[in-house]
């Protein structure tokens, strides 16, 4: 955990949100985007997005993604025709950003502890990686993370240990992404801290993802849905994830399948 939740944290966080959350949600659904919520046939996606929109009063939806806020903003415009609406809360930048889903404004109560862990890390790590073979910067606007594309054939994987000597974590995922994150910060740690701030019961939470940067969510012990199109490296971790269900369906179909598996099928029409 990044920090102990401050007394009165729930009410303080609600004050930082631009739109209210469900008071007592029956389900807290935490979804990755690419390969998960954004995957499936157009028919499946329209049906699932429509359900999320109709059930906002009892399903608290959280995006938990590697995308930065600018990319999420573009996505919500791009997929509006499919019925995709803003979530209640966004965890972005692989856990380094927490924002109101409606306004995409960062929430200081959740972000400040992450910011403190990143202080003094950016410059030395960026200098170390400058010009590294098999590595190219991702065009993102994140301030608490370094993000690169990497070529698994030419990148020197031995460099990961050298990167982490700077007091950061280095995460490889989907055979193409390399993220440098504040030590101890990931999708799972930030999600757990958010749930504690909001005083949400863990037995109402279901997470869903498809790539290696979702592993930290599944390692929390919360109910997890590994969608059927999950990358091989994530599937390999399944035997040590007793609370994670491997769905047959891809993307949205897999999420729905997982909701039924964990006893939330009554919420689906």
Which ranges hold each PLM region?
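Non-catalytic pre-domain segments flanking phosphatase-related domains
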Residues: 1-33, 44, 50, 54, ...
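Mg2+-dependent phosphoryl-transfer enzymes with acidic/Ser/Thr/Gly-rich catalytic loops
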Residues: 20, 24, 181, 188-269
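Hydrophobic "anchor" residues on beta-strands that sit immediately upstream
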Residues: 28-30, 89, 206
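Active-site phosphate-binding/coordination module
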Residues: 42-137, 229
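Short, aromatic/basic amphipathic alpha-helical patches
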Residues: 76-78, 160-163, 234-239
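Conserved acidic, metal-coordinating active-site core of Asp-based
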Residues: 122-220
